[in-house]
A protein has these predicted regions:
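Short amphipathic alpha-helix that is part of the acyltransferase structural core
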Residues: 1-30
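Short hydrophobic/aromatic beta-strand or adjacent loop that forms the aromatic wall/cage
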Residues: 43, 143-148
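Conserved beta-strand in the GNAT
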Residues: 47, 53-61, 67-74
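A short, internal acetyl-CoA/4′-phosphopantetheine-binding micro-motif in the GNAT/acyltransferase core
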Residues: 73-81, 110-112
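Conserved acetyl-CoA-binding loop-helix of GNAT-fold acetyltransferases
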Residues: 81-94, 122
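Conserved GNAT acetyl-CoA-binding A-motif
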Residues: 96-115
Length: 152
């Protein structure tokens, strides 16, 4: 397994599409998925490879002068629980710190709504994120937005 930082926007789009389309439990809304794909091109982007096959990625989005957001992350289901997401995060966090950011945030569906998102919440907590705030209707009333934060 190797983690690389990608700079080519076409490659970022292709990786984002292939992985998000394989994860409909988390990325099943076509419009949202297309937005993630489109936005990936100019973001700080990290990709995990098994040989030459992309198996996971994440990208960061600046949300303030001192804050970056772990904007989207996906790891193919057959590669879950192998440390890939954690390694992607560690490299992204290190890069964000070197770039001068002091804080990182991530948004997900609030714990207790869907089993898939409960595991996502537990993963972010295990990385050291802390609960910051819930926006009950930011996305819609069925998907309350949990914001987690951490110091970098």
């Amino acid at each position: 397994m190797k983690i690389c930082q990608l700079t080519n926007s076409t490659e970022k789009h292709a990786v984002t599409r292939s992985i998000l389309e394989a994860l409909p439990e988390w990325f099943g809304i076509p419009e949202a998925r297309e937005d993630y794909i489109t936005e990936s091109g100019d973001k700080q982007f990290f990709c995990a490879y098994d040989a030459d096959k992309p198996v996971g990625f994440l990208y960061l989005k600046e949300t303030g002068k001192a804050t970056v957001e772990l904007y989207v992350m996906g790891v193919l289901k057959e590669y879950h629980r192998q440390g890939i997401g954690r390694e992607l995060f560690q490299q992204a966090r290190e890069a964000a710190g070197k770039a001068g950011y002091s804080f990182m945030q991530v948004k997900t569906v609030q714990m207790g709504r869907y089993a898939e998102y409960d595991s996502t919440n537990r993963f972010y907590l295990s990385l050291g994120f802390q609960e910051f705030e819930v926006f009950p209707t930011l996305w819609d009333e069925w998907n309350p937005c949990q914001v987690y934060v951490m110091a970098i």
